[in-house]
Amino acid sequence: MTSSSLSTSGISTRTTGSTLLACVGRGLLAGSAPTDNAGNAFVQLGVAHTYTLWPNSGTALYACERAQGRVGHAVTVPKPKDTDETTLSIVEIANGGSVRDVQWREVLSGNPLTSASVTTTGPALLVAWWWGDAGVDLDKTAVPDNDFTVIDSVLASGALVQCAAATRQVSAAGTYNVTWTSTPPQGAQLWLVAVQAA
């Protein structure tokens, strides 16, 4: 899509108390944080990371704790140029609390696509992103293990930044990771976040 920004379609979010996570993949990596139409401020978690195979492209993760919500809530990210391949993934954690741990890892093709581990001190929602590094040909698949459930994905062939997002609710303190299986064979950038009630 040719546009100076990319926005989610209007969604209904809780009026108060949610944690919003925004994971962004760009064909031309840029450091601009998301904005929204509810007046929230998104803070970057860690740093942006480029792909080994695509050194101009990369991903970044942002969060807003205790977010204000609304009907028709739209989150927007600026694009470094109008024709940039940009993918935006938004996850709302109702009554989310605080980001307890966040980890990133890049795994190249031929190795298990296992994320770095996050540690919680109690019950938490885990949110994982898979950003594959395959080229434009063929539709993709990305399937997580360890009881994670895919909640959204962009896996079609074509000039886009492919992504899958998955979640898992854990009931106790512990250390957790996730391994993805994908087709065609490829590497990926892997994010894993633990959001824990305050």
Model-assigned labels for residue ranges:
Residues 1-122, 130-198:
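Function-critical acidic carboxylates
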